[in-house]
A protein has these predicted regions:
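Alpha/beta-hydrolase-fold catalytic nucleophile elbow
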Residues: 170, 231, 256-257, 300, ...
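Catalytic-domain carbohydrate-binding cleft regions of carbohydrate-active enzymes
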Residues: 231-235, 240-251, 255-262, 269, ...
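Bacterial N-terminal signal peptides
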Residues: 18-31
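N-terminal secretory signal peptides that target proteins for export/translocation
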Residues: 1-17
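Alpha/beta-hydrolase-fold serine-hydrolase catalytic core, especially in secreted/extracellular enzymes
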Residues: 36-119, 293, 300-474, 482-493, ...
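Primarily recognizes the serine-hydrolase "nucleophile elbow" in alpha/beta-hydrolase
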Residues: 213-281, 551-621, 625-626
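Loop/turn elements at helix/coil->beta-strand transitions in domains of secreted/extracellular proteins
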Residues: 132-134, 162-165, 224-227, 248-252, ...
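Cap/lid segment of the alpha/beta-hydrolase catalytic domain
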Residues: 131, 136-219, 259-271, 478-554, ...
Length: 677
């Protein structure tokens, strides 16, 4: 092993590995599947091929000037993906709620404002040492206790005893900042998904909030603002990597059990807090590491970690980042320490971090591990800013913040010409033009047809259908995410035949026979397939729209039919609406169970992550604005639902209908809305 990579052996009891299993276990399962049979998973194979194609031209910058240009562009792209950051910061309004006195340090329970009305809970571990101190921001991963968790406490206590001012914070939606007041709530899947429509993914909010934590550190008289570091493990490692890359006030950055490659995420189940929409369309993880240069960077990996965080994947990114550090005459950075261990932030990892922070924030030592001083941990409840149920009643949760921002966006929204709105939808969905997609039509029996569809390289879809009874009759394109044998599909076929129209059944990619195994995480039935699509900058909903448009165009070209209407229920309902809204060659839609708004102050329930298109509320509008683009073509809505999957009551249904009716004007008979289950 190269001299810049340190291997540390660690024997530890399983009981010390306290990990949030609902996150890591799916990751490990998917990581195993990665090596077993990728060919058996056509959608995953397609995603990986697409990612590899996007990044095949990556090469080290020729010189420092070339890197500076790449760096500027990448920062612009990242800020765009994160939805931008406020130009003016909300006042910190910091308050110390309580102080715990300990022999070598004191622990202060602190809250401060990061965004208007949004407060971060934190703990400051303040050494009893005079003079300006180096400081370390400790961010947590997906351990249930967040900043209170023993894994986080251990490094806080160790750093404080070694003379560092330490600030441990709760991430938005986790720890004391969860929806409920008990520790252990998960901020990912359909909780974090509420942020996508407003264009503010959780990964970006974490970067901004960790920057506000630095603002707080700089406000403390005990802290030397020129000597600040950041560290965390797992999801906290991702926070460390991104915040360290973005905020140059961090002089030493130490992500733990988190660095790998973006392409390794494709096949794993990772938290929404780790997703940067479109990241693979702009870069690989190595370039994020390179953004830290010329500041100090230590990466700690575990030999028994999941594939996406594995030693080998981390080594790929480190190797690709090292040429950038060399441009600054820093060939020994980034440092890579490998610990024989499962996913963790254990004592050998902490000791490696202590040596690194001591070297780069104190100017002492060579960066070799420093033995951990004796530490005492607190009861998690004793560290809480708001123990038990004492949190203020007006506390703003993550979904409530998303809903507040969404309402503000809609209130300030200006009407857009239909052509511009269609263009915006096309861009937000990642491009839905059929492009070079092809299809071959065969007739296995009189009056029936099969369409072998190749929408993109590496993908093949098969449609079955029945011809219209005459050239004057229409055709219903039935969209399903539950397989062509589902009872609802059979019923739609029967209704079409009774009306004399033809029908075709399209199984949406990544569903039915192409369903991704283990796709559901929590309330998100399509968590992994939708997440992988976001990494590519191609929301899964947009891929469905592309397939729908290609199918409709080929059917119109190859079959005698007077019109093509879309029929959808549940999965694919918003994709159907978006397809007919964008493509004026589709003649209408009959949709059951359509989500009626992206605005939700609670986690989504009964919805698809695929439909939570990043930035759609900000740049286009709500579901109603998309629906208006269908006019004057027929649109029939049955049992539309709330963001929590509940049918609209009569009053809400009437309100929705009244909002839509002006778009149809003299064609009101073409707009139908039926409430209920």
């Amino acid at each position: 092993m190269a001299s810049h990579c340190l291997l540390v052996r660690c024997r530890m009891a399983r009981s010390t590995v306290c990990v949030l299993l609902q996150i890591l276990l799916p990751s490990l399962i998917c990581a195993t599947a990665y090596a077993q049979a990728p060919a058996e998973k056509p959608f995953l194979s397609f995603v990986r091929q697409t990612a590899a194609e996007l990044r095949k031209q990556d090469a080290p910058p020729a010189d420092l000037a070339a890197w500076q240009a790449q760096r500027t562009l990448l920062r612009q792209q990242l800020e765009l993906a994160w939805g931008g950051f406020p130009q003016q910061h909300a006042p910190l309004e910091a308050r110390i709620l309580e102080t715990l006195d300990r022999p070598d340090y004191r622990i202060e329970k602190i809250v401060f404002q990061t965004l208007p009305g949004v407060f971060m809970t934190a703990s400051a571990w303040v050494p009893k040492i005079s003079g300006k101190l180096p400081a370390v921001l400790c961010v947590h991963g997906h351990w249930a206790g967040a900043k209170q968790d023993p894994h986080v406490q251990a490094r806080c206590a160790g750093l404080a005893r070694l003379g560092f001012f330490v600030l441990a914070v709760d991430a938005f939606g986790a720890g004391e900042r969860a929806i409920g007041e008990q520790l252990g709530e998960y901020h990912g899947e359909m909780t974090a998904a509420t942020l996508f429509p407003i264009g503010r993914p959780l990964s970006g909010i974490q970067v901004y909030e960790n920057g506000r934590a630095v603002d707080y550190l700089c406000s403390r008289p005990e802290v030397d603002p020129q000597r600040i570091g950041i560290t965390g493990a797992s999801g906290g490692g991702n926070q460390s990597m991104y915040a360290g890359a973005w905020d140059e006030r961090f002089k030493a950055v130490a992500p733990v059990c988190s660095v790998g490659t973006y392409q390794a995420y494709l096949g794993a189940a990772c938290c929404m807090c780790e997703v940067v929409p479109g990241a693979l369309a702009m870069t690989e993880e190595s370039r994020i590491l390179a953004l830290t240069a010329p500041r100090a960077l230590l990466i700690i990996s575990a030999t028994q970690d999941a594939f996406q965080f594995s030693v080998g994947e981390a080594a790929k990114s480190i190797s690709a980042a090292r040429p950038v550090f060399s441009l600054y005459n820093l060939p020994d950075l980034p440092r890579h320490t490998v610990v024989e261990s499962p996913h963790d932030y254990n004592q050998p990892m902490r000791e490696a971090m202590y040596g690194f922070m001591t070297q780069h924030l104190k100017g002492q030592g060579t960066g070799q591990p420093i033995p951990e001083p004796s530490i005492s941990l607190e009861e998690p409840e004793a560290l809480r800013c708001y123990p038990g149920t004492t949190r203020p009643d007006d506390w703003l949760t993550l979904p409530q913040f998303a809903a507040r921002e969404a309402r503000g966006l809609l209130q300030s929204r200006k009407p857009l010409p239909p052509s511009e709105l269609r263009q915006r939808l096309e861009r937000l969905l990642g491009g839905t033009e059929p492009g070079a997609g092809t299809g071959q039509l065969t007739s296995p029996a009189p009056g029936t047809f099969e369409l072998q569809l190749k929408p993109e390289a590496g993908l093949q879809l098969q449609l079955v259908g029945r011809n219209p009874k005459s050239a004057d009759a229409g055709l219903r394109l039935i969209l399903t995410g539950q397989g062509s044998d589902h009872p609802w599909v059979r019923e739609q076929q029967r209704l079409a035949e009774a009306a004399g129209t033809g029908w075709a059944v399209l199984e949406l990619r990544a569903t039915g026979r192409m369903e991704v195994s283990g796709d559901r995480i929590g309330k998100a039935p399509d968590h992994n397939s939708a997440e992988w699509s976001l990494w590519l900058g191609r929301p899964l909903c947009g891929q469905w729209v592309r397939d729908i448009r290609l199918t409709a165009a080929l059917l119109r070209e190859k079959l005698p039919c007077s019109s093509i209407e879309l029929v959808a229920s549940g999965t694919g309902s918003f994709a159907a609406l978006a397809a007919v809204a964008i493509d004026e060659n589709i003649d209408g839609a009959d949709i059951t169970g359509l989500l009626t708004t992206f605005v939700s102050d609670k986690p989504y329930v009964g919805q698809r992550l695929a439909d939570m298109v990043p930035g759609i509320l900000r740049d286009a509008g709500d579901v109603v604005h998309v629906a208006e683009l269908v006019a004057p073509r027929p649109l029939r809505l049955h049992a539309p639902v709330t963001p929590q999957g509940e049918p609209l009551d009569a009053a809400a249904a009437n309100e929705l209908l009244s909002r839509l009716q002006p778009a149809w004007q003299e064609n009101s008979e073409r707009l139908k809305l039926t409430a209920g289950k």
